[in-house]
């Protein structure tokens, strides 16, 4: 007979796929229209001039140009802008 009991099942053993969030293009970088600048959950970064926002809060460039980040107001609102090249 076996000297050990059979191993029971476990409730662990699963994990979600990585979502690849974060800043994709940094301040001063030159980008093309449609390029993703920030992938995020919620609006940690808000769209500014020449920046659009997707339904999953992804920020993307509306024109070709250079990326710039700014912090404004008493609430330290982070805004992303694209200056046309």
UniProtKB/Swiss-Prot annotation:
UniProt-annotated stretches for the region Disordered: 1-21
GO CC entries: cytosolic large ribosomal subunit
Gene3D superfamilies: 2.40.50.100
SUPFAM superfamilies per the UniProt record, alphabetical: Ribosomal L27 protein-like
GO terms under biological process: translation
Keyword terms of this UniProt record: Ribonucleoprotein, Ribosomal protein
Intrachain disulfide bonds: none
Keyword Ribonucleoprotein attributed: yes
Record flagged with keyword Protein transport: no
Domain of life (superkingdom): Bacteria
GO molecular function, one term: structural constituent of ribosome
Ranges of biased composition (kind: Gly residues): 1-10
Recorded family membership: Belongs to the bacterial ribosomal protein bL27 family.
PANTHER family: LARGE RIBOSOMAL SUBUNIT PROTEIN BL27M, RIBOSOMAL PROTEIN L27
Protein name: Large ribosomal subunit protein bL27
Native source organism of the sequence: Polaromonas sp. (strain JS666 / ATCC BAA-500)
Gene name tied to this protein: rpmA
């Amino acid at each position: 007979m076996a000297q050990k009991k059979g191993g029971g099942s476990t409730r662990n053993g699963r994990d979600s796929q990585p979502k690849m969030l974060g800043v994709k293009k940094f301040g001063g970088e030159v980008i093309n229209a449609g390029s993703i600048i920030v992938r995020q959950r919620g609006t940690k970064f808000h769209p500014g001039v020449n920046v659009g926002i997707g339904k999953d809060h992804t920020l993307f460039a509306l024109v070709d140009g250079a990326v710039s980040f700014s912090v404004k107001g008493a609430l330290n609102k982070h805004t992303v802008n694209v200056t046309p090249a």
